[in-house]
């Protein structure tokens, strides 16, 4: 055990020296075919180590439990640190001086995991060379772990993660990486329609500084389809009328005869809102938003008016109460949003589908995620932002994980049979 501990301590020390002298490891050095060559060299080296195990003590030591336990303990400890320390995105520098916030590029972490991977590979070769059906579960488990570790690390260099900004009606085939470099892709996406489902509007009371009341735990009224009246901050609130898609009557009158191309260019400012008359009317035009007619009472005081969160076409409107307070509608929160798209591929596919948040679509090795949209335009957004991810080594990682699970189940079953005997 002392030798294994000494090796791990040496790897940690060497890793720290490399970290401070060379900086974090750049996995881009292992882009294909470098990662494939590295994997082949590693396997050949492990085979040579096994053949020379009787001549070189170190090679035979690699297959012992005295080598495995310190390596597993160090890897587990570093993984725990990785889970506790907040990790920064791959394109950002480490947030701390040592580099614990970018653990996947942290030399001590990499060297310890590399050492553990070598031990797993060497034990797999040893078990395979002494093959028996009784050992099949443990061979399968070790082989799966070796495949998962090597392919997940070496394959990370080939993973592509790109953002694509698609405007309605225009096919787009270019994506941006984390450094804003443009990449032309073998697939194109055309946005046909963006849809969004929103949570019911929320009303709250704010002070003259714009802070919700009460300060520590603001009160909120959820105005769903069944809400008629309620109380907030000492005021009794009654909903007289609710229009889910509304625009100021004055704005609707101004643009009704305009061409559609010009309607989106007209915006009602705060001055126009102050001068407006006629309240709000139901409208299907782009830029409409929820508007609620409110009667607020407190003792003998009564306030009536409209409340809306506004949109890119017109600003929000509040209901003035007393002592500088106002009743406001918070910005609507999205419950679900998705894009109806056409996906074109170089091999002639034309796929019509819907891409929803957390429900990616997979085509030709690419996973397409709904990432964002034009939040200023909200549900009327004419732009969808997609994230496209391609990981050519992912299937190999899955194979390793499945083998690991199969081996674990096999060991559990064989252990049960031994107990019965």
Regions found by a protein language model. Name each.
Residues 1-421:
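Solvent-exposed, non-transmembrane regions of integral membrane proteins
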């Amino acid at each position: 055990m002392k030798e294994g501990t000494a090796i791990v301590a040496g790897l940690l020390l060497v890793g720290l020296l490399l970290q401070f002298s060379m900086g974090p490891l750049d996995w881009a050095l292992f882009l294909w075919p470098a990662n494939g060559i590295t994997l082949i060299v590693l396997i050949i080296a492990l085979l040579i180590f096994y053949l020379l195990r009787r001549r070189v003590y170190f090679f035979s030591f690699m297959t012992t439990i005295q080598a495995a336990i310190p390596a597993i303990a160090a890897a587990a400890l570093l993984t725990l640190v990785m889970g506790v320390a907040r990790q920064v995105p791959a394109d950002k520098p480490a947030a701390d001086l040592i580099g614990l916030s970018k653990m996947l590029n942290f030399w001590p972490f990499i060297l310890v995991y590399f050492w553990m991977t070598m031990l797993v590979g060497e034990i797999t070769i040893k078990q395979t060379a002494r093959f028996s059906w009784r050992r099949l579960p443990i061979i399968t488990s070790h082989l799966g772990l070796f495949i998962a570790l090597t392919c997940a690390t070496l394959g990370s260099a080939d993973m592509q993660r790109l953002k694509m900004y698609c405007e309605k009606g225009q096919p787009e085939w270019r994506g941006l990486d984390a450094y804003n470099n443009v990449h032309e892709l073998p697939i194109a996406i055309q946005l046909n329609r963006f849809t969004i489902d929103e949570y019911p509007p929320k009303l709250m009371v704010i002070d003259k500084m714009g802070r919700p009341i009460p300060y520590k735990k603001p009160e909120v009224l959820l105005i769903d389809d069944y809400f008629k009246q309620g109380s907030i901050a000492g005021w009794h609130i009654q909903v007289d009328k609710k229009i889910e898609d509304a625009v100021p009557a004055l704005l609707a009158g101004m643009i009704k005869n305009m061409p559609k191309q010009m309607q989106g260019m007209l915006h009602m400012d705060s001055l126009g809102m102050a001068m407006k008359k006629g309240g709000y009317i139901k409208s299907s035009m782009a830029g409409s938003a929820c508007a609620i007619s409110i009667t607020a009472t407190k003792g003998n005081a009564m306030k009536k008016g409209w409340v809306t969160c506004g949109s890119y076409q017109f600003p929000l409107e509040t209901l003035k109460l007393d002592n500088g307070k106002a009743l406001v509608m918070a910005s609507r929160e999205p419950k679900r949003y998705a894009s109806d798209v056409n996906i074109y591929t170089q091999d002639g596919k034309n796929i019509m589908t819907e891409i929803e948040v957390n429900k990616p679509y997979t085509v030709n090795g690419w996973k397409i995620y709904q990432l964002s949209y034009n939040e200023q335009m909200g549900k009327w957004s004419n732009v969808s932002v997609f994230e496209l991810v391609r990981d050519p080594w992912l299937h190999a990682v899955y194979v390793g994980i499945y083998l690991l699970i199969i081996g674990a189940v096999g060991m559990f079953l064989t252990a049960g049979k031994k107990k019965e005997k």
